Swiss-Prot record:
GO cellular component: post-mRNA release spliceosomal complex; Prp19 complex; U2-type catalytic step 1 spliceosome; U2-type catalytic step 2 spliceosome
Lineage top rank: taxon: Eukaryota
A GO biological process held by the record: generation of catalytic spliceosome for second transesterification step
Main location: nucleus
Highest classification ranks of the organism: Eukaryota, Fungi, Dikarya, Ascomycota, Saccharomycotina
Protein name: Pre-mRNA-processing protein 45
Pfam families: SKIP_SNW (PF02731)
Subcellular localization(s) per the UniProt record: Nucleus
Gene behind this protein: PRP45
Function text: Involved in pre-mRNA splicing.
């Protein structure tokens, strides 16, 4: 017996005799298991299962024992058979298919023949409804929440009178003139934006019949308004003139103050300049005296050479400094050639620029480094021209020593 077998059948499933019998058998088995778990006597009783623990009025000691500690005499819940499992599977499959069939049903496909003129021949078009996802939300808007007001039937119906009817009374010209409103005086309509004075505004007494008459009080009011307007304008002009005069006076006072300040500053600068000149002369004299005292005495050339040699870490004799020392001659007084690089190395031996500097000069000059891999067109042209100017066989000459050269020179001189 499975858990799905205990569930009730689907709501919309048709009644079946086989299903009802199976349900009865399952319920009986369920009652038997419940009685066996709750009461010992139910195991030895017949399959009718008359009487239950709920209906009994007398309580036993076994009723107090917990279910986990009771001995059920080997009673086991029967497992469902393969036939029951298959029946449950078929029923659930039918219900699921019936629910999904509403959404996934294609509907009957419609066929329509194309009647257009086609050279290749006629064709048939199939029309099918698109499949919808059953889990997709509905696209229709919920219009039930909208409030629709009922139509108002009680509208104001206009009352129309027939003009041809004899009962209808027509208005005369006098009545129309009473209801007429002049365009200049109308407060409802003034599209051109005209302004009307009080004199002309008071002359619209068509209702009273006094068309051309103007009240004297109106003219008095107009005159009073004009007078007050003129007085106000004159007062404003006078106030503006007073303000202008005050501003001019303030500007004049400011200019005078600035001029006085400028004159004072000029006088102060002139007096300070005169004082500074005198102090400068006196200060310059004292400063020159201090400089002369602080300056070291003038040293001779010999003393300076001694100091220079001492700074370079060399010992130079006084004869060398004074130029009295003479170069020693070797042998018979022949000309001895010295390499000038020895002197430069000796002079720069103690004057190293840094501890990392091992050699006096770099390996290559910077210009030679830059032109290592650069082709020099001038040198190539010179080499070509020299090679082209050569002609004849190569002649070798015998090398001469220094002694041979000196004897040859002596012979030429003699």
């Amino acid at each position: 017996m499975s858990f799905s077998s205990l569930l009730p059948p689907p709501e919309h499933s048709p009644p079946d005799d086989v299903n009802s019998r199976e349900v009865e058998i399952i319920t009986k088995e369920h009652d038997f298991i419940v009685n066996a778990l709750t009461k010992k006597e139910a195991v030895h009783s017949s399959n009718n299962n008359i009487g239950s623990f709920v209906g009994s009025q007398v309580a036993n000691f076994n009723d107090v024992i917990p279910l986990r500690q009771k001995d059920f005499y080997g009673v086991q819940a029967p497992l469902p058979t393969t036939q029951e499992i298959e029946l449950c599977k078929v029923r659930t499959q039918e219900v699921v298919n019936r629910l999904l069939h509403k959404f996934t049903d294609k509907g009957k496909a419609g066929y329509q023949k194309d009647t257009r003129k086609i050279t290749t021949g006629s064709r048939i078009i199939t029309i099918e409804s698109k499949r919808q996802d059953p889990l997709q939300p509905s696209r229709q808007k919920n219009t039930s929440s909208k409030i629709v007001l009922p139509e108002d039937d009680e509208t104001d119906t206009p009352i129309l009178h027939a003009t041809d009817d004899a009962k209808s009374k027509r208005l005369t010209k006098e009545e129309r003139a009473k209801w007429n409103i002049p365009a200049a005086v109308s407060s409802w309509k003034n599209p051109m934006g005209y302004t009307v004075g009080l004199k002309h505004r008071a002359a619209h007494g068509k209702k009273t019949g006094n068309v051309g008459s103007i009240n004297n009080k109106v003219s008095d009011i107009v005159a009073a308004l004009d007078e007050t307007d003129q007085e106000i304008r004159e007062g404003i002009q006078q106030e503006n003139e007073l303000k202008r005069k005050q501003l001019k006076e303030e500007e004049r006072i400011k200019e005078e103050k600035l001029r006085a300040i400028a004159e004072r500053s000029k006088i102060q600068t002139q007096s300070s300049a005169v004082k500074k000149r005198g102090s400068r002369f006196e200060g310059g004299r004292h400063q020159n005296k201090k400089i002369k005292k602080e300056e070291p005495p003038i040293k001779s050339a010999a003393e300076r050479l001694k100091e220079l040699a001492y700074a370079q870490g060399r010992e130079v004799s006084e004869k060398v400094i004074l130029g009295a020392a003479k170069a020693t001659t070797t042998g018979t007084g022949a000309n001895v050639h010295y390499d000038s690089r020895l002197f430069s190395k000796g002079a720069n031996a103690a004057a190293k620029r840094s501890e990392e500097q091992v050699y006096d000069n770099p390996l290559f000059v910077q210009q030679e480094i830059d032109s290592i891999y650069r082709v020099n067109a001038k040198s190539i042209d010179e080499a070509n021209s020299v090679s082209a100017s050569r002609y004849g066989p190569i002649q070798f000459t015998k090398a001469h020593s220094l002694d041979d050269k000196s004897t040859a020179k002596d012979e030429e001189e003699t």
